[in-house]
Regions:
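Conserved N-terminal beta1-alpha1 strand-loop-helix module at the mouth
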Residues: 3-66, 74-76, 91
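Glycine-rich phosphate-binding active-site loops on the catalytic face of alpha/beta enzymes
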Residues: 44-47, 144-150, 166-195
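Short, acidic/polar
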Residues: 23-35, 79-85, 123-131, 170-174
Length: 195
């Protein structure tokens, strides 16, 4: 977790060795993806303040990188203190959030950061460009991830590595996103995890 030397590389190495990130919504999902040796990175999209430490521990015990989507954890408010809570009370390697202030706080605390964006229109595209300069997340996740032309445009206009997420259901989607320049794809689809 400390951002120095080797530890700083852990999330980059995880997506480097396998560009498929398992996005999980239940303990059943966690058990399934923890059993797949090739899966290195896990996006945790569920839990609450009482269970998140156990959820993260299960992922870490399996030797995987645990990224918690802080916006989706019940009982945590969209404030910086929530990031501090995760850092102090869990073994999470980092956070995912749509909120730049939370990304900024996580970076200060030495956690990995994924700024998640929903690409609804050209304004959202402009916002990505502006905010990546201000917040400097480690990765930007764009949703939906099934728009290779848009992903290619984003990759051409930002320096931050891009993760494609949302609606990725088959090998064709994965290959299209990676060919467009995404460094990885995140998916809740169990078939995609086994690729």
């Amino acid at each position: 977790r400390m951002r120095d030397g080797k530890m700083d590389q852990i999330f980059y190495d995880a997506v480097g060795s396998n560009p498929i990130i398992a996005a999980v919504k239940s303990m059943e999902d966690i058990e399934k993806c923890c059993a797949i040796e090739e899966i290195q990175g896990i996006f945790i999209l569920f839990g609450d303040v009482c269970s998140i430490d156990r959820i993260v521990k299960r992922v870490k015990d399996a030797g995987k990188v645990a990224m918690v989507h802080v916006d989706l954890i019940s009982g945590l408010s969209p404030k910086e203190i929530s990031v501090e809570y995760l850092q102090e009370h869990t073994e999470a390697d980092g956070i995912i959030s749509t909120k730049p202030s939370l990304i900024k706080k996580a970076k200060e605390l030495g956690m990995y950061t994924v700024l998640r964006y929903f690409l609804l229109d050209s304004m959202a595209f402009e916002n990505i460009r502006q905010q990546q300069h201000m917040v400097r997340p480690d990765f930007i996740e764009v949703l939906p991830g099934v728009m290779p032309r848009v992903i290619k445009r984003i990759c051409g206009s930002v320096k931050t590595p891009i993760i494609a997420g949302g609606l990725i259901t088959d090998k064709e989607d994965v290959m299209a996103a990676l060919s467009a320049g995404a460094i990885a794809v995140s998916s809740t689809n169990h078939q995609v995890w086994k690729m």
